[in-house]
């Protein structure tokens, strides 16, 4: 299965989301590319979900979104007028790798269990901007194991709900999914 309208930025985000959904998604190279595709591109007037790092870069298009919920490491946003959703991953001003480390800890494992560095800078260096990340057996094993994490399971549920309901999303139902423990 392929979800073209689900657009993660960077390779580790794409690898995790594809693993969680057990499907292909539409990789974008940056948060700006995700926003541009939603605001002016193919999905301008269509359903779309962007998945971006919650980093320091401010994207003007995101100012048209309202927060509909959050977890420790995920912020869920909905466009005021369109069927556009954005999920910011990680704590504020942090990259996806902080989300990964947090959720690996949540399932009682360590990065070393996947033969990956526990040092954040080293992990970022290993996972950033590399097509090989999507085929790396260590990364794939990590992403599969992370499905056990309650927060990753919530991400999976929200993405599956959005993909199944595209133009018929019940915001109250979505908020309940996000708030559920």
Model-derived segments and their meaning:
Residues 1-181:
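Acidic, divalent-metal-binding catalytic cores of TOPRIM
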